[in-house]
UniProtKB/Swiss-Prot annotation:
Effect of pH on activity: Optimum pH is 7-7.5.
UniProt organism field: Escherichia coli
Needed co-factor(s): Mn(2+)
Record-given protein name: Chondroitin synthase
Location of the region described as Glucuronosyltransferase in the Swiss-Prot/TrEMBL record: 418-682
GO molecular-function term, one example from the UniProt record: glucuronosyl-N-acetylgalactosaminyl-proteoglycan 4-beta-N-acetylgalactosaminyltransferase activity
Binding positions (UDP-N-acetyl-alpha-D-galactosamine): 157, 161, 188, 217, 223, 239-240, 361-362
Residues holding UDP-alpha-D-glucuronate: 441, 469, 517-520, 581, 603-604
UniProt keywords, alphabetically: Glycosyltransferase, Manganese, Metal-binding, Multifunctional enzyme, Repeat, Transferase
Amino acid sequence: MSILNQAINLYKNKNYRQALSLFEKVAEIYDVSWVEANIKLCQTALNLSEEVDKLNRKAVIDIDAATKIMCSNAKAISLNEVEKNEIISKYREITAKKSERAELKEVEPIPLDWPSDLTLPPLPESTNDYVWAGKRKELDDYPRKQLIIDGLSIVIPTYNRAKILAITLACLCNQKTIYDYEVIVADDGSKENIEEIVREFESLLNIKYVRQKDYGYQLCAVRNLGLRAAKYNYVAILDCDMAPNPLWVQSYMELLAVDDNVALIGPRKYIDTSKHTYLDFLSQKSLINEIPEIITNNQVAGKVEQNKSVDWRIEHFKNTDNLRLCNTPFRFFSGGNVAFAKKWLFRAGWFDEEFTHWGGEDNEFGYRLYREGCYFRSVEGAMAYHQEPPGKENETDRAAGKNITVQLLQQKVPYFYRKKEKIESATLKRVPLVSIYIPAYNCSKYIVRCVESALNQTITDLEVCICDDGSTDDTLRILQEHYANHPRVRFISQKNKGIGSASNTAVRLCRGFYIGQLDSDDFLEPDAVELCLDEFRKDLSLACVYTTNRNIDREGNLISNGYNWPIYSREKLTSAMICHHFRMFTARAWNLTEGFNESISNAVDYDMYLKLSEVGPFKHINKICYNRVLHGENTSIKKLDIQKENHFKVVNESLSRLGIKKYKYSPLTNLNECRKYTWEKIENDL
């Protein structure tokens, strides 16, 4: 296994490319599962540098001004002061134009013909309103799936601390629960004989032992090792020094059994168990609840009140109804005492093994859960007691570790933490704050102008994601020619499947938390993203922000300003498509829906924004931020008969999702170009 040792040493010395090559050889010779995590670490480390390498190989003159400056700031390309200032001046000139205000007219927010007895269900009180989410699942026409409640797999990562681990295991022997559970001790290469401790409990617990070699602080890797060994559909992570109270398993499982879309967070208290052995806890089942609280040695994670350390999160739990009213709940997701459905590992990904120092990895993992649509809830009954190490002993320097991981966290968690940067200091980020998605089909004449308008925004923390939907013209070739090596542009090509499929593919390619929609023949005003982003930052509960547009011809000449309904209301959107370009929504809101409908060719956007309107509030900006090119081939003005049919279809499907059965949205006339409607009341036969 000398080849493996060589690979590990190369990785430690940051020679990632050679390390990757050797890890891949190990996979060929032995088993890919041995080095799967190592290969991923190398690929992650190489990702940004490879993008920069590609940029260096491409003529810098072809890259947009903002990207040049960001690469220069990151020392990826060399620019002298004169060159840099010239490019900054060019960028400011390109982005100087401000969006025009749209003409306003007085309107009623709720249409006058809206039925007086038709009430739309309330929206959530926050983006994390798990009570609202539970009620949404109960709606008659909402898709249901039978939960398989098989048990809880408890993963306990450990490095040494055999005595403390034994006490934690003893407390797991004392659980009062109707649910099955297993314990998986995941050893991060301890020097102490952890396996011997596990054997002590083989007759008392359903327990497993897994181990990896000591490669330094590898908490994420050892958590993943334990999670891969889990046999149940529900998993909990419990640090080895976190002794659970007797109702810990029951408190978690009785909630997970009701809703597997909620990740649960247990609070902690700080105690000293150094005067006890695990036998004391086996013989006195309530002992863990009786030991007095103390002041912790960990000055990073705790705060002191009344001569004892308290969990800093508890006050926030109380103020937000156990996080139900919190718009950033992932910030309180501490991996030492949590539980969730295992399905989320396959949706959001596993713990990020690039975190090799103390802190931050649980927030990053929690952010990915949140972005994917998971809810969070604190559970008082899942209290665990943090056992302080004797003599202030600690295997990791937490404060120093946090100084390192906070930088990685800022790179990988754009939402909430990330602030706007000035162009003079802006750099490329591992995970951008904003993604602009573009479904593209036969748009070779317009695609470069389209993409450049997205890159030349006053917000630079942004990427562009494109799905070429099997174009038969030069669209794909042009994308490859202009953007194959661009660090802020990603594109993919697929067989022609229609606008719904191309939109879904492009959105799934997006890494940002905020996602903007741009059609491939249109282009943005330079401040479009910033205007929307400002509204999102003012109100974290927003699911979507949209502006208005102007219609232009192929040459860019003004035809007319676009239709603009100046005030958003759910009732108006349920009656007519008022949510026009430019539109931005959160990735979380989109993940709470079924995505774009791939079975229809028209009214695809109307359907999508009705879905988004069902999961969160919208905000309208009365500014013209979007240029819509009318060339006769636009899907919204072709095949008017199908467009009309789908228009009424998607509204009625929205009503069905909302559990509204007493009204049907019906066309008033048979004319294809007519969108006049009537609310048809459906009499109940019962």
